[in-house]
Amino acid sequence: MSKRDFYEVLGVSRDASERDIKKAYKRLAMKFHPDRNQGDESAADKFKEVKEAYEVLTDSQKKAAYDQYGHAAFEQGGGGFGGGFGGGGADFGDIFGDVFGDIFGGGRRGGGGHRAQRGADLRYNMELTLEEAVRGVTKEIEVPTLVHCDSCDGSGAKKGSSAETCGTCHGHGQVQMRQGFFAVQQTCPTCHGKGKIIKDPCNECHGQGRKQKTKTLNVKIPAGVDTGDRIRLSGEGEAGEMGAPSGDLYVQVHVKEHHIFERDGNNLYCEVPVSFAMAALGGEVEVPTLDGRVSLKVPSETQTGRMFRMRGKGVKGVRGGGIGDLIVKLVVETPVNLSSRQKELLKEFEESCGGEAATKHKPKSEGFFNGVKKFFDDLTS
């Protein structure tokens, strides 16, 4: 089957810049990466095709040869792979490491020698109460992870023995294969990129150098965190291969809903009910805060929904910026379960507000009905 044009594979024009080529490669490599398409042979083939196109079009010599001769440029002098194995040559692993190293927890292997793979990063979802998030707290957590085997010190080899340098790649973890007059590096098929062969594996970890364990950690949560904040614990992720550095543990914070307060940034919000008599006549009402109850003076003739700001009663931000405020919304309650006498008093009150002077006791009603009147006047004019 004939190969597709490399420019077509990456979806770029022939005069595309190296930056455009790299951008297209990253997008397609992410899309077709085997770790994201496990078991999908079609995606694996497309990933190889994209990688091959990128390797050619970002190398000035290869690109010039391809632009002049097409795929035939890489089939000269033997037509395909040949020339045996070697340890040197150009390294095309750099861009692969740049794109996928952070996503899949991997390091990258350079042409100058093998570097063991860093351990994978882990994530732990932690749920906090609002009080814990605002004040800070230390939480004990248990994390299942991979740790270095203490029996072999992470080497994978039985105590008293050691791993041997791979004879195929001479410890590089990669081998060089020749395609036409170009050399391409690939993962060593003997040691699978590790650079070493373990002939006498450790009985504890079966040659892996790592074993499963549940770690207990005390995590200090700083005051002021909020949902979406992430705390990094360096080196508390999975242990790396063959003694390589461990990954990191990221604690993802989620703050549970509170039955009184809502949080927006460093400010807190709450609703406080008041009787219609207090709203009309004024008075004082107790308001809950995270530090205890405080009194709020309610002015006379307060309408429902009015907001009051209590400065410094909010949250101290984890990134600084001072302490937020508590915003109190007063909600005027309509009385229920009235006795006959209470109903009579309310009727008397309503009648006393009637007549031409009624609107002066109901400022919102006056504005509303004036607006309704104007609306219908406009319709009929």
Curated annotation (Swiss-Prot):
The keyword DNA-binding appears for this protein: no
Binding sites annotated in the UniProt record for Zn(2+) 1: C149, C152, C202, C205
Q: Where is the J domain?
A: 5-70
Q: Please, one GO biological process term? A: protein refolding
Q: Which GO terms describe its molecular function?
A: ATP binding; heat shock protein binding; unfolded protein binding; zinc ion binding
**Cofactor: binding comment:** Binds 2 Zn(2+) ions per monomer.
Q: Which GO terms describe its cellular component?
A: cytoplasm
Keyword terms: Chaperone, Cytoplasm, DNA replication, Metal-binding, Repeat, Stress response, Zinc, Zinc-finger
Cofactor dependence is on: Zn(2+)
Positions of the CXXCXGXG motif repeats?
A: 149-156, 166-173, 188-195, 202-209
Its localization reads: Cytoplasm
* Domain of life (superkingdom): Bacteria
* SMART domains recorded: DnaJ (SM00271)
Zinc-finger (CR-type) residue ranges come to 136-214
Q: Which PROSITE patterns match?
A: DNAJ_1, DNAJ_2, ZF_CR
Known role: Participates actively in the response to hyperosmotic and heat shock by preventing the aggregation of stress-denatured proteins and by disaggregating proteins, also in an autonomous, DnaK-independent fashion. Unfolded proteins bind initially to DnaJ; upon interaction with the DnaJ-bound protein, DnaK hydrolyzes its bound ATP, resulting in the formation of a stable complex. GrpE releases ADP from DnaK; ATP binding to DnaK triggers the release of the substrate protein, thus completing the reaction cycle.
The domain comment in this protein's record states: The J domain is necessary and sufficient to stimulate DnaK ATPase activity. Zinc center 1 plays an important role in the autonomous, DnaK-independent chaperone activity of DnaJ. Zinc center 2 is essential for interaction with DnaK and for DnaJ activity.
Identify its protein family.
Belongs to the DnaJ family.
What's the name of the protein?
Chaperone protein DnaJ
Q: State the organism named in the record.
A: Vibrio parahaemolyticus serotype O3:K6 (strain RIMD 2210633)
Primary gene name = dnaJ
